[in-house]
Amino acid sequence: MKLTGEVVLITGGASGLGRALVDRFVAERAKVAVLDKSAERLAQLETDHGDNVLGVTGDVRSLEDQKQAASRCVAKFGKIDTLIPNAGIWDYSTALIDLPEESLDAAFDEVFHINVKGYIHAVKACLPALVASRGNVIFTISNAGFYPNGGGPLYTAAKHAVVGLVRELAFELAPYVRVNGVGPGGINSDLRGPSSLGMGGKAISTVPLADMLKSVLPIGRMPEAEEYTGAYVFFATRGDAAPATGALLNYDGGLGVRGFFSGAGGNDLLERLNINS
């Protein structure tokens, strides 16, 4: 397996894409520490994966919680090779005109504190261990870090900020730590919204994303969370990704190559090539 003996710390790793990443990295024989706010889901991870996983309950907005996750990871597994800042919330595409004036400041702070400051805290907390291991950071971005309409102005601005973090930290931490980013598209998950906008109990799985993306993406469907994990394994693999730092992999299902009048230009290929589906 590609990551035998490697140690990975993932924030927001107890559900959604984060959970898929934990499963994939364990399958690649890595040891994984997870910082998440849900003690119940962390306990389930440890039950499912045994000594391969360490769960740490905490809030990514707290530098002390992030430092505790880093120190407990090193105490149990001896090092940190890969850090994946992944915890986040979505603003459910709340447009500027729909943002209540009385909630705007709180909503901005909540989205940016989790989606941006939480990432900075993670790197700050893990930096000594990452430099010591000559490790790497893989930021979870989003297609909203590259295109409009993947969220409202708060989410989109936050994800564009993460793109800037990848580039700046790739410079600042070279040559000892590689820093890259993966931009997944929509995933049917438990991703929540800002509590400051009354969306803390709302999950993205309640949105008919599969139907929406089927007609928009050239690949013709919404990918599963597991299908995005290979990009993270690639960046974490020392041999395969040694030259990669400051790289941004926008996994957009072909959104960037949509035609003006249709999502995919090859819809008639099976018929024209006489291939039975």
Curated annotation (Swiss-Prot):
Enzyme class at the top of the EC tree: oxidoreductase
Keyword check for Ligase: no
Residues that bind substrate: S142
Disulfide-bond pairs as recorded: none
Biological process annotations from GO: catabolic process
Binding site for NAD(+): 9-33
Transmembrane segments: none
PROSITE patterns per UniProt: ADH_SHORT
Key word Disulfide bond present: no
Catalysed conversion reaction: (2R,3S)-3-phenylcyclohexa-3,5-diene-1,2-diol + NAD(+) = biphenyl-2,3-diol + NADH + H(+)
Alphabetized SUPFAM superfamilies for the sequence: NAD(P)-binding Rossmann-fold domains
EC number: 1.3.1.56
Pathway in which this enzyme or protein is active: Xenobiotic degradation; biphenyl degradation; 2-hydroxy-2,4-pentadienoate and benzoate from biphenyl: step 2/4
InterPro entries associated with the record: BphB-like_SDR (IPR047950), BphB_TodD (IPR017711), NAD(P)-bd_dom_sf (IPR036291), Sc_DH/Rdtase_CS (IPR020904), SDR_fam (IPR002347)
Keyword annotations: Aromatic hydrocarbons catabolism, NAD, Oxidoreductase
Superkingdom of this protein's organism: Bacteria
Active site: Y155
Entry GO MF terms: cis-2,3-dihydrobiphenyl-2,3-diol dehydrogenase activity; oxidoreductase activity, acting on NAD(P)H, oxygen as acceptor
Summary of subunit composition and partner proteins: Homotetramer.
Cross-referenced PANTHER family: BENZIL REDUCTASE, CHAIN DEHYDROGENASE, PUTATIVE (AFU_ORTHOLOGUE AFUA_4G08710)-RELATED
Family from the record: Belongs to the short-chain dehydrogenases/reductases (SDR) family.
Identification of the protein by name: Cis-2,3-dihydrobiphenyl-2,3-diol dehydrogenase
Gene that encodes the chain: bphB
